Each structure stands twice: as C-alpha cells, then as structure tokens.
Curated annotation (Swiss-Prot):
Residues 102-219 are annotated as: Urease beta. Its EC number is 3.5.1.5. It is found in: Cytoplasm. GO terms for cellular component: urease complex. This is Urease subunit gamma/beta. Heterohexamer of 3 UreC (alpha) and 3 UreAB (gamma/beta) subunits. In the N-terminal section; belongs to the urease gamma subunit family. In the C-terminal section; belongs to the urease beta subunit family. The lineage of its organism: Archaea, Thermoproteota, Thermoprotei, Sulfolobales, Sulfolobaceae. Gene3D superfamilies: Urease, beta subunit, Urease, gamma-like subunit. One of its GO terms (biological process) is urea catabolic process. It comes from Sulfurisphaera tokodaii (strain DSM 16993 / JCM 10545 / NBRC 100140 / 7) (Sulfolobus tokodaii). It is an enzyme of class 3 (hydrolase).
Amino acid sequence: MFLTPREQEKLLISWAAEVARRRRVKGLKLNYAEAMAIIVDYILEKAREGVKMEDIIKGAQELLTENDVMEGVPELLDLVQVEATFPDGTKLVTVRNPIKSSKKTLNTYIIKQGEIEVKGEEIELEITNTGDRPIQVGSHFHFFEVNKALKFDREKAYGMRLSIPAGTAVRFEPGQTKVVRLRKIGGGRRVTGLNGLTEGSLEHNKEESIKRAKERGFA
C-alpha cells in the first residue's frame, strides 16, 4: 500500500489520538501532545465526514475539559490550526481555546512599557464570492491579492489586510456578498509571494501591481 507523506502523518495522528483516548479512559491526565492529537484527529475525521466548519469548531471546543489534562496544558493549547480535507476541498480549520480553563491568566497579556502602535484608518469594502467554492482569507493576507473569484474594488485594497485578530480568518461562501473592514499592513510594508502581484515594497510598487492584477484577471 502506497501512502503519501500527508496520509502517513494523518495515520500517525490517528494512532496517537487512540493511545491518548485509552490513557484518558484509565484516568490518566493528558499531556500537551496527547490532548493535541485527540483534537486534531477529531477535526480531520469530522471534515472527512463533511460536517460543517462551525460545527467542527464547536465540537472541538467540547472534547476535553481542564480536568482531563495536566496543569498548564489549556494555556499552551490556546490555538489549534489544521488543514483538513472536506468533500469540496482542503480548508484551514482554526480552533481558539479548545480546552476551557478556570485560570484568570488564560488569554491575558502583560504589556511591556513603551510605545503602542494604534491601528490607523480603516475602510469598508463589499466583497462577493463569484466562485463555486468557499474562500477563506487570513488576517494578514494582502487583501489586494486574494483569490480572483472575489469581486470588489481591488485597487482600494492595495496595501491593506483584514481588520481582525491575528490568526483568524474570514470565510466567503459561494455567491455570498459580505462587507469587511480593512486596515493598512504595518511593519516593513513589504509583500512577496502570495499571488505574485506586489513582490516588494508597498510604497513603490502600486502602479506595477495594479497593472499585473489587470493582466492576470484579478481586476
């Protein structure tokens, strides 16, 4: 039997999850790897069954409790992201805080002294998914370069990203129209890769980027 590296990885996760479930039945508290295996295996299996994304996320957050795991595991497992195969393709499933904790320190931040960068001006754009498949866009993806099946005023999105928490995403269902808020990309303001429309500084490549977008059917 020939298995791809991805299929081998899924089998390893499945077996690790089975071992973890046995230990849980014995009353043993799960460590980080065991808890992660159970959650990831659940996500992969439910995706294979065609369960809706929101139902998978909800179910993953109800699998384990603070009493099932060793001390500190809920704080370590604050975010789980899995590329799962659904009947209509591969999608990124993001589960935040899958194990609820009673500790007040969970998801709190200690802010160091110094200057804090406040997010700048935001814009709103109406986006329509004209494709036949769902499209998910991550928090820090250069919105100007998103899937060409998303129709909107692309030029206004140049140098912008979704104004949502880091690590999260917005999902556009086929035929759906949705209004989103965008903010300027910070930091060094350089974009490379993605769909290859910018390839460099956002400050100096705008005209060339817009030209590429039109030539390649993005705008």
